[in-house]
Amino acid sequence: ESFIKDQDPILKFDSCGNFMDLNIDERYHHSLEVDSENRIYVPIYNSTDNIDRSLYSEAFYDDGFSILDSNLKNLAKFSLLNIYKNNGYFGDIHSEHNPGTDPFHLNDVQPFKTSDDRDIVLLSIRNNSRILAFDITKNNALWSIDRAVSQQHDIDIFPDKNNEKI
């Protein structure tokens, strides 16, 4: 349980371990990744404030991710429920069966730049056993890898031998 009721903050410390700042805007969880511009990518719980409770139980929560600057200020926020709705994946969590309370369980948000300089994230969505490539500028899914592994967690990108971008 968090030391701040109903919050899972992200904390910032200096290299000596001295507390510098915190952000309690969201319920942050699992990993965090930093891109080449020092933006922080971190999964969040309940990323949609306006979940239609006629479709989802009170226990249902939507995962998503936030992008923060190096001072922990929120730059952008994305909802997996909205990403799934807007990109043809909605049926994967909302078919004739109840989607349950945790249809996504986002474990990792791995940022990278493509060879044409687009900002992409790879999302590790445990409960769908899916890795989803998402263009954060165009707000659209590019591709997914489904069930290649079961309930994966961390995504790491290794440069090829020529250190080329994907």
Predicted regions and their residues:
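Short, conserved, GDST-rich strand-edge loop motifs in beta-rich repeat architectures
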Residues: 1-6, 44-61, 96, 114, ...
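Blade-loop segments of beta-propeller domains
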Residues: 1-34
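A short loop-to-beta-strand structural motif that recurs across blades of beta-propeller domains
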Residues: 8-11, 64-66, 130-133
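Short loop/turn segments that connect beta-strands within beta-propeller blades
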Residues: 13-17, 68-72, 135-139
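Surface-exposed loop and turn segments in beta-propeller and other repeat-based domains
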Residues: 20, 73-102, 147-148
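Short coil/turn segments at the loop-to-beta-strand junctions that recur within blades
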Residues: 24-30, 81-85, 140, 147-152
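Signature of short aromatic-glycine-proline-rich micro-motifs recurring in repeat-based ectodomains
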Residues: 27-29, 47-50, 61, 92-112, ...
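Beta-propeller domains
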Residues: 101-166
